[in-house]
Design a protein with these regions (language model features):
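Catalytic-core signature of thiol
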Residues: 38-72, 78-82
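Deubiquitinase catalytic domains
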Residues: 13-16, 67-131
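Active-site nucleophile-adjacent alpha helix/oxyanion-hole segment immediately C-terminal to the catalytic cysteine
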Residues: 2-56
Length: 131
């Protein structure tokens, strides 16, 4: 995936785990939970989160995850809730990109903030998650 250049995405509050490809959702969750336990020089690498993957129940979850798979993921991991924000880089001009509140899924008090980025390439709609 290409890097996205936008002031909101290029600050220290939002980051992506590089090379996570189909598992961007999973690594966004792991980064939200464990990035403070990982050396800052390596928290963008999937390998930094390998030992934490076993803390999440991903049984019967297929990757790349689709919207309909988020509820089963939360049923497998009832201590988590997810607040989804939407970022659609095509609908809005490059100078006026906005992030919209979408919804909170789950009933837990531990809410993970996820940025859902929708983009288009070769007439296909593609999605990527950021933590």
């Amino acid at each position: 995936m290409e890097d996205i250049h936008h002031p909101v995405l290029n600050n220290n509050s939002i980051f992506k785990v590089y090379q996570s490809k189909d598992e961007s959702f999973l690594y966004s969750i792991l980064a939200a939970l464990y990035s403070n336990k990982i050396d800052r020089r390596s928290f963008h690498r999937p390998s930094a989160y390998e030992k934490y993957k076993k803390t999440l129940n991903i049984k019967n979850i297929n990757f790349p995850i689709r919207n309909k798979d988020i509820v089963p993921f939360l049923q497998n991991n009832p201590k988590l809730s997810i607040a989804i924000r939407l970022f659609d880089s095509v609908v809005i001009s490059e100078k006026d990109m906005r992030i919209y509140e979408y919804k909170v899924i789950g009933k837990s008090s531990q809410v993970i903030n996820i940025l859902f980025h929708k983009y288009y390439r070769n007439k296909k709609t593609l999605y990527h998650f950021f933590g």
